[in-house]
Curated annotation (Swiss-Prot):
Name used for this protein in its record: Glutaminase 1
GO molecular function: glutaminase activity
Keywords noted in UniProt: Hydrolase
Organism listed in the record: Bacillus anthracis
Quaternary organization: Homotetramer.
């Protein structure tokens, strides 16, 4: 596959930049409302030539829903497929990511998949560790290993901002506790979940996460398997079917690669056996995806022939 060059990325960002004006920040999490809606950055981490980047590629932002892929991988390592999927389903949903509707109307009453908030909260409740400090340290260690960046941490400011306003997520937790999906203390779970969502990365870190998943869990630079192949396969399948909120189907048609977005404006994607892509653009479309980030990936995929379909 032909290697993309930095000047191509810079030209692409200039071409797509006007799209940022069409999006809006995720102001329902107060701290995310402080981002610059004009920011736009990209990094591509290749299996052989390291990375290229352009724009606001070194600006820190929080993982938010991108962390759901990380914790799913950890929960599968900790508990195994049988247990994880006895509590959380495997099917996409046409409802908003924070909806309670399917929990009430689906039988058995379990979240449809790990990429919606209810499913992600159930997944986080499964993580091994004696307390939240140990569990959070495991999440951070995992992200640091995948990114090869030992400085990665979480933003307590963003975590606290989310914790103070997470009324709907608390509702999801109480409903799941009533139905035996989770059995832990709700406030402790909310504390851990908001911290996991507040892990800070930049586009280069995100692209390296994408590379590890593109290589089926193998790190071509450290020459070692970081995540078992079968676990990355499960994660990438969910990324295709549910990774871009209610635009997952359209994204599959227009871009056609496994990807996961977050409401801080991040998107990471993977091109199998080749590279990972990390994008930051906090101006979001109506579905909660980076509006310019989606367009960048659409143009790159068409240009480079990335689609898996």
């Amino acid at each position: 596959m032909q290697c993309i060059e930095t000047n191509n990325l810079q030209q692409l960002l200039e071409q797509v930049k006007p799209y940022t004006k069409k999006g809006k920040l995720a102001t329902y999490i107060p701290e995310l409302g402080n981002a610059n809606p004009d920011d736009l950055g990209i990094a591509i981490f290749h299996k052989e030539t390291e990375y290229i980047h352009a724009g606001n590629s070194q600006t820190l932002f929080t993982l938010q829903s991108i962390s759901k892929v990380i914790t799913l991988a950890l929960a599968l390592l900790d508990r195994g497929e049988e247990y994880v999927f006895s509590k959380v389903g495997m099917e996409p949903t046409g409802d908003p990511f924070n909806s309670i509707i399917k929990l009430e109307t689906t039988s058995p009453s379990k979240p449809l998949n790990p990429m919606i908030n209810a499913g992600a909260l159930a997944i986080t409740s499964m993580l091994a560790g004696k307390d939240n400090e140990e569990k959070m340290e495991r999440i951070l260690h995992f992200v640091r290993e995948i990114t090869d960046n030992p400085t990665i941490n979480y933003s307590s400011k963003v975590a606290n901002s989310e914790l103070e306003t997470a009324y709907l997520n608390r509702s999801l937790c109480y409903y799941m506790k009533q139905n035996g999906i989770i059995d832990c203390d709700i406030e402790e779970l909310m504390d851990l979940y908001t911290r996991q969502c507040a892990v800070e990365v930049n586009c280069i870190d995100l692209a390296r996460i994408g590379l590890i998943f593109a290589m089926d869990g193998y790190d071509p630079y450290k020459k070692k398997q970081i995540i078992p192949k079968h676990i990355t396969k499960i994660c990438k399948t969910f990324m295709v079917t549910c990774g871009m909120y209610n635009e997952s189907g359209e994204f599959a048609i227009r871009v056609g690669i496994p990807a996961k977005s977050g409401v801080a404006g991040g998107i990471f994607g993977c091109v199998k056996g080749e590279m990972g892509i990390g994008i930051f653009g906090p101006a979001l479309d109506a579905n909660g995806n980076s509006i310019a980030g989606f367009k960048i990936l659409e143009l790159l995929s068409a240009q480079e022939g990335w689609s898996i379909f």
